[in-house]
Amino acid sequence: MYNILDNYEDVDDIKNMSSDELKEFASEIRKFLIDKISKTGGHLASNLGVVELTLSLHKVFNLKKDKIIWDVGHQAYVHKILTGRKDKFDSLKQFNGLSGFPKRNESIYDAFETGHSSTSISAASGIARARDLSKDNYDVIAVIGDGALTGGMALEALNDIGYKKTNVIIILNDNQMSIAKNVGSISKYLNKIRLDPKYNKLKKDVKTKLQRTNIGSEVANSIERIKGGIKQMVVSGMFFEDIGIKYLGPIDGHNIEELTSVISKAKEIKGPVILHVKTQKGKGYSYAEENPNKFHSIGKFNSKTGEALSKPKDTYSKAFGKAMVQMAENNDKIVAITAAMTDGTGLCEFSKKFPQRFFDVGISEQHAVTMAAGLAATGYKPVFAVYSTFLQRAYDQVLHDVCIQKLPVVFAIDRAGIVGEDGETHQGVFDISYLSSIPNMTIMAPKCVEELNYIMNWAVKQNYPIAVRYPKGGNDISDVLAPLKEFRHGKWEILKDGKDVAIVAVGKMVQRAMVVRDELLKYGIDCAIINATFIKPIDKDTLNRFARDNYKFVVIEDNVLHGGIGSLILEHLNDMKFKNDVLNLGFKDEFITHGNIEILYKLYDLDIEGICKRIISFK
């Protein structure tokens, strides 16, 4: 089926390929990716954009000793194909299948695991310094996108390696930023001579000789100032040069000859160097080229039409976005903040209708939280929409800048609970634990999509920090639950009365608990169902009443058990000297792999059958 790909066996096979063969290979890889991802889902556009870049890196470097770190990691599919994992792509992102991100236990060619952005340069600097301490000899390459480069961690790492002159090669995969008009022929010429070792040696020798005399030193400094002024006008990489990192580029990221040539020369430069590569997301697939956001991370789709196979449904993200627009229409103090996740968090419509009150700060969660605190301190009602897994990056800002001052920031925590196919780095199963430990923080969760609107409207009217957590997708199992429309701080909703057993469920697990209740009635077990709308503070009055009536408690949450709501309930019952039995159902103290959500629930006994079995044994 594929002339080159079918016969490719080892990372060294690429070394002797001609430019024409590499171009044909690139075409085959694109066809392979489109075919496979259309059947499994995955990150398509970003991988189509780095085919030539990845081939060039593999051709120039010796992957049996050199280390490539892929920032974020979702653009590493081509790397996986070239490192012996082509035959596993039918299982991409499936349970026990090929991960969508680099995994050290998956291949010796995955030097470092990634998933969150802006980490690659820091990791590369650590690996490079370990190499130098051990007196080893290999290259360390960090591949980072223009979006990830906006992250504070990436800038911190650049500052460090530029100052310390750490020998690291950085590939800036730029698929979005525009290049100013003055970056043209002059820039190309300057890059050409800066790549020439004779030029670099001559420049160093001239400066050394000039500095031997007082007059020469002044001349040398003047030349440096003049040269710096010219470069400032014509070279977009001046920022990198100023902090001590050699800048090369920009170059065409789809021109294999130019890529291999410049990468080879970058390899010879001592000290940190950044190569600016211009690529196109979705390259080679017209639908992805026209709509790269849609194909950034997509489910199964028809490769001939580009249309998704599953029909879109009402989701929590859409409900949140709709609620934000409605609230903003009635309250000009409401502002929305996102960290480069406008589409994912459902804020597209808000950004268009209220551009002055919409802030996309880039991949800067720490900055986003403290900026929200500043807005709240001056009378505005900031809502920070963020994935659960990414809010982890701003824990100190939540604690130090928001909660100590008890500022009314609303955290709209999307993708809470397990998210499935993206695996360990993206499962949102820690937010209850890390937020419940912070004084002045209130945590809420809607039991259904429809309830989120009412919670958001209530939350923005309060004068203290509130986190509202909700899952990926839409209603879990049942869509017949009526949303709670009025809330009292720290009070739960009793959905069903019962005997002997009280199930306290959080968020989407409430719908699951309702189905479990119906199943358990067949075994003569009549459970009360409590919707823990407030995770913190817990409803102590309701707990006390059920405890005094000698109920056993079953707590179901989509969070790790350590520090979850079950822990809060146990702590309260212990403080009150109650002896009621408590069964906590949640996730173990381990990182949760990738796979279909229902398969993962079954793995942890959080599917309907598993929950029923645990309660029957407990009863």
Curated annotation (Swiss-Prot):
UniProt name for this protein: 1-deoxy-D-xylulose-5-phosphate synthase
Cofactor(s) needed for function: Mg(2+); thiamine diphosphate
Gene3D superfamilies named among the record's database cross-references: 3.40.50.920, 3.40.50.970
GO CC annotation terms, alphabetical: cytosol
Lineage: Bacteria, Bacillati, Bacillota, Clostridia, Eubacteriales
Cofactor binding notes: Binds 1 Mg(2+) ion per subunit. Binds 1 thiamine pyrophosphate per subunit.
Catalysed conversion reaction: D-glyceraldehyde 3-phosphate + pyruvate + H(+) = 1-deoxy-D-xylulose 5-phosphate + CO2
Protein's job: Catalyzes the acyloin condensation reaction between C atoms 2 and 3 of pyruvate and glyceraldehyde 3-phosphate to yield 1-deoxy-D-xylulose-5-phosphate (DXP).
Residues bound to thiamine diphosphate: H74, G115, H116, S117, G147, A148, N175, Y285, E365
Enzyme class: transferase
Gene designation: dxs
Pathway this chain belongs to: Metabolic intermediate biosynthesis; 1-deoxy-D-xylulose 5-phosphate biosynthesis; 1-deoxy-D-xylulose 5-phosphate from D-glyceraldehyde 3-phosphate and pyruvate: step 1/1
A biological process term (GO) from this entry: isopentenyl diphosphate biosynthetic process, methylerythritol 4-phosphate pathway
Domain of life assignment: Bacteria
Annotated GO MF terms: 1-deoxy-D-xylulose-5-phosphate synthase activity; magnesium ion binding; thiamine pyrophosphate binding
Subunit comment: Homodimer.
Any Pfam family hit: DXP_synthase_N
Transmembrane parts of this sequence: none
Similarity comment: family membership: Belongs to the transketolase family. DXPS subfamily.
SMART domains: Transket_pyr (SM00861)
PANTHER family cross-referenced by the UniProt entry: 1-D-DEOXYXYLULOSE 5-PHOSPHATE SYNTHASE-RELATED (PTHR43322), 1-DEOXY-D-XYLULOSE-5-PHOSPHATE SYNTHASE, CHLOROPLASTIC (PTHR43322:SF5)
Binding site for Mg(2+): D146, N175
Keywords linked to the UniProt accession: Isoprene biosynthesis, Magnesium, Metal-binding, Thiamine biosynthesis, Thiamine pyrophosphate, Transferase
